[in-house]
């Protein structure tokens, strides 16, 4: 059985999320999974609706989120990440489908974000493992 993945990718910090998306696609192929659809959203906070759309599809086995939440001058990064992570988990439980978190942050500098682009690979691997094990 080939595992079909949906990607939800944030455009904010696109220099990072583009690299992450490419790594995620390569790793999916390495694991024998297929990225069936990719939805680009403005930012991490905007992901839940796109995740829900993919979770509703019978031809998607799991959803991988890809984004990067970088620290700013306010606590905005904390708020964005906390709410997004909570909703992402809720959608996984609501649809009984793996939704994995490939979003490093919050409290992270841009340099630290560059060092964490491999989070996309981790999220793809988690999605594939969950589909196989559940």
Curated annotation (Swiss-Prot):
One of its GO terms (biological process) is riboflavin biosynthetic process. Keywords: Riboflavin biosynthesis, Transferase. The keyword Transferase applies. CDD domains: Lumazine_synthase_archaeal. Transmembrane segments: none annotated. It catalyses: (2S)-2-hydroxy-3-oxobutyl phosphate + 5-amino-6-(D-ribitylamino)uracil = 6,7-dimethyl-8-(1-D-ribityl)lumazine + phosphate + 2 H2O + H(+). Pfam families: DMRL_synthase. GO terms for molecular function: 6,7-dimethyl-8-ribityllumazine synthase activity. The keyword Endoplasmic reticulum does not apply. One of its GO terms (cellular component) is riboflavin synthase complex. Signal peptide: none annotated. The active site is at residue 76. (2S)-2-hydroxy-3-oxobutyl phosphate binds at residues 73-74, 116. Pathway: Cofactor biosynthesis; riboflavin biosynthesis; riboflavin from 2-hydroxy-3-oxobutyl phosphate and 5-amino-6-(D-ribitylamino)uracil: step 1/2. 5-amino-6-(D-ribitylamino)uracil binds at residues 12, 44-46, 68-70, 101. Belongs to the DMRL synthase family. NCBIfam families: lumazine-synth. This is 6,7-dimethyl-8-ribityllumazine synthase.
């Amino acid at each position: 059985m080939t595992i079909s993945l949906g990607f939800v990718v944030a455009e904010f910090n696109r220099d990072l999320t583009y690299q992450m998306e490419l790594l995620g696609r390569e790793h999916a192929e390495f694991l024998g999974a297929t990225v069936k659809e990719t939805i680009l959203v403005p930012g991490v906070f905007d992901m839940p609706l796109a995740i829900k759309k993919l979770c509703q599809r019978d031809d998607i086995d799991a959803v991988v989120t890809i984004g990067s939440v970088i620290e700013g001058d306010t606590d905005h990064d904390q708020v964005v990440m906390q709410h997004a992570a909570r909703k992402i988990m809720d959608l996984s439980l609501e649809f009984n489908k793996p939704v994995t978190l490939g979003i490093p942050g919050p409290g992270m500098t841009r340099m630290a974000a560059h060092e964490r682009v491999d989070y996309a690979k981790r999220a793809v691997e988690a999605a594939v493992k969950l589909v196989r094990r559940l």
